[in-house]
Amino acid sequence: MDESRARALRNDLTTFASRWWAGEAEVTRTFFSQKRSKDEHLRWLRMQAFKELQPRPNGIIIRLISELRDDYNRLEHGVDRHDFLHKIQFLEEEFRHYQLFADVVDYLTGEKITPEELAQYEVPEEVRLRELRSSLMKEHGDLARFASSFCEGGGASLYYEGMQVGGDALHDMIATACRGVYEDEIEHAEQGASGLEQGHWTEEQWALA
């Protein structure tokens, strides 16, 4: 497949996904267009903090820490230093996202949120999404990994809309948190899109993506 065809298919995929990203943006705008109670904010903020930390045995933070520990013992002996650094940077990003939203939770409650408290905010839809991504990656490998990265964070719609709020201390903190995540998610999406565009995929694989 030539470069121009791959770029056209990437654009088609973006157009296809955009309808759902627009829907997420509309939901977020609607939420912030009305005055919300402390409990309403705490619910979504705790769910978001959970999503970033994933406080469970196979959660992304603890998994990356474990992988880095194992990889360090093989550094330059099967583990490339650039790949090792990339994993460190990814760990920093994910934990920083948690820190940003957890700080807003602490501001509202006046107490420190703990991983144990956050564990109760895992919703069934998140579990199903995680299981779906895992099964697709096992079946389709890099194709599913790039497609998942491309769509990561719902096109960053929530974070983009959240960046626009402000006017008081709470909403300023929310905007700061969303801005910090937005910039990273856009980069992840670009990496996924580039991986798809530069891969040697067939028309059928693009349709599957």
Predicted features, each with a name:
Residues 1-209:
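Non-heme di-metal
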